[in-house]
Amino acid sequence: MASSVPSARSAYRQLLRATRIAFRDDIRVLIAARQEARRNFDSHRRQGIDTPMQINHAIEVANILRHNIVQGVRESEDEAARWELRIHDEIERGDNDSIKVGGKSVKVDKPCSA
């Protein structure tokens, strides 16, 4: 019978894939994120009571990296240069209904990812 809780190996792979997507062209940050993931997984190598919570935490971090992290890059080295955002296909895009109303409360009847 298969367990509904993903394995630590699966969560680790999801985390590595998410770092690859989020930090695609930023090698320094990509390496640092992967080292941090490895350090956290190595520090919880033995299975304990909180192992399922740790696995779920890793999966949640992977989802945040994959869907909510956008990096910006300057078009040139000039201090006044424009910033370009690296938005990929998996970024969660919301609507701007609350901005259009201007100070009035807005009832949002759908999630941002819908």
From Swiss-Prot:
One of its GO terms (cellular component) is mitochondrial matrix. One of its GO terms (biological process) is mitochondrial respiratory chain complex III assembly. Keywords: Chaperone, Mitochondrion, Transit peptide. It is found in: Mitochondrion matrix. Residues 1-75 form a transit peptide. Signal peptide: none annotated. GO terms for molecular function: protein folding chaperone. CDD domains: Complex1_LYR_LYRM7. Residues 95-114 are annotated as: Disordered. Its main location: mitochondrion. Interacts with RIP1. Assembly factor required for Rieske Fe-S protein RIP1 incorporation into the cytochrome b-c1 (CIII) complex. Functions as a chaperone, binding to this subunit within the mitochondrial matrix and stabilizing it prior to its translocation and insertion into the late CIII dimeric intermediate within the mitochondrial inner membrane. Modulates the mitochondrial matrix zinc pool. Belongs to the complex I LYR family. MZM1 subfamily. This is Mitochondrial zinc maintenance protein 1, mitochondrial.
